[in-house]
Amino acid sequence: MPYKFTFDLSVVPHKFFKELAYMVDSKRIHKRTGRILRRLIDRFKLSELTGMDFAEILQVIEDLVDIQVKNLAYRQRFEMSKNKALFLPHCARKYVDSRCRAEFDPDVPTFRCRRCSPDCQVNQASRIAEELGYDVYIVPGGSCIPKIIKKHNYDGIVGVACGEEIRLAYTYLNEDIAAQAVPLIKNGCSNTVFSIDSLCKILQSQKI
């Protein structure tokens, strides 16, 4: 959890994210366009909804914009990639104790989902990705990802993580890898949350 604060954007109206995505897709916004972001934050009363300081919510939203911009930049190459993997954070499991039946493989390292909870986001995401032909890794941390990518020569990857971890990941991905990212909308050490709908749109995007 690289952020020095916790956040929960699951309370934010879906309309906010739709408007943010539209502004990025139509090239009407850039990460440094703080004035536009400040207006959006004020209009949707995000500080009041989330209980976060304005500076904290601004940092998170700036990271969301940066992720969306990078997704757009790499989208075409990602759609054409053939050997793909999905990396999920283990903290998004419904349970992070013995109630979770996932088996940990230290040689990879990854958790192997045993499908114990139908309403678990990791269960849902991994099932969808595997049906689409992705290799799936439920990782204990980001430091193991470069080794996995190198070993299997993936040319397209999808990562789910908090915005700051995603930003750090771009620093060790080489130019031969087309990456797409889905940011957490609720961070923390457990019970983190991401948008299954956003992930599915990325997973299903490919050139035939």
Provide a role label for each language-model segment:
Residues M1-R93:
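Electropositive, gly/pro-rich neighborhoods at or near active sites that engage anionic ligands
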Residues E79-L132:
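Redox- and metal-dependent alpha/beta enzyme cores, enriched for Fe-S-associated oxidoreductases
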Residues H90-K94, P118, G142-I145, G159-R167, ...:
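Gly/Ser/Thr-rich loops at beta-strand to alpha-helix junctions
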Residues S98-R99, I148-K150, R167-T171:
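A short acidic (Asp/Glu
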Residues P106-V108, A169-K186:
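A short, gly/pro- and small-residue-rich
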Residues C113-R114, Q180-I208:
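Ser/Thr/Gly-rich flexible loops in soluble cytosolic domains mediating phosphotransfer, phosphorylation
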Residues Y137-P140, G159, A181:
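General beta-strand structural signal in soluble alpha/beta enzymes
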Residues N153-Y154:
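Proline-aspartate-enriched helix->loop->beta-strand connector
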